[in-house]
């Protein structure tokens, strides 16, 4: 398979669907944190799986330790989600979520997982729902340090040579909180999404 599997019209349609999904994620995050969320325009690419680790470069907004939460999803479409934070951010989560007392390290990590669960669920659900695909989620888990995408995105030959990657940066400017959401879809799911977009466009035209 090559990247032309998604025609220009279908890629444009997917971009609009992703924009809506990320908008829902921003609304969920704003509701949890009680602050306006600024979302960058999502980037969508079909890439060779060997290039996926390059997408984890967070040098544009963090040159220090990175906290990452991973959450696989499965069902009509199968993939992985990552939520990346500057390593200093978990210490601020208690204040962001309205906790008066200083949390323990374990409590900070629980807050991080809870937050990622909300945002990742909104992102993936916002993409799957318009395409009438049902997805379920595995429990989120924390990855220490800078995550190695090759460990779970590149290394499985059964998932094909290409992956669809949805990448969006977000920040709460007044709360000094920023991060990145990455959604990885394997080649078999890319074929299914192509079919789902075709049905979606036909429904709009009817």
Question: How should each PLM-predicted stretch be described?
Answer:
Residues 2-206:
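Composition-driven recognition of glycine/serine/threonine/acidic- and proline-rich low-complexity segments
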């Amino acid at each position: 398979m090559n990247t032309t599997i998604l025609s220009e019209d279908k890629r444009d349609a997917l971009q609009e669907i992703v924009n809506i999904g990320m908008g829902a994620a921003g609304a969920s995050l704003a509701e949890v944190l009680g602050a306006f969320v600024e979302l960058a325009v999502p980037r969508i690419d079909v890439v060779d799986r060997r290039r996926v680790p390059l997408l984890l470069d967070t040098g544009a907004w963090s040159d220090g330790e990175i906290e990452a939460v991973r959450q696989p999803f499965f069902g009509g479409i199968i993939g992985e989600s990552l939520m990346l934070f500057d390593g200093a951010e978990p210490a601020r989560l208690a204040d962001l979520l309205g906790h008066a007392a200083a949390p323990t390290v374990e409590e900070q990590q629980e807050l991080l997982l809870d937050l990622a669960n909300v945002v990742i669920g909104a992102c993936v659900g916002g993409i799957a729902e318009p395409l009438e695909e049902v997805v379920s989620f595995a429990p989120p888990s924390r990855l220490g340090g800078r995550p190695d995408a090759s460990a779970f995105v590149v290394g499985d030959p059964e998932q094909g040579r290409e992956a669809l990657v949805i990448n969006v940066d977000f920040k709460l400017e007044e709360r000094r909180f920023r991060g990145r959401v990455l959604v990885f879809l394997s080649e078999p799911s890319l074929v299914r999404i192509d079919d789902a977009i075709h049905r979606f466009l036909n429904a709009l035209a009817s």
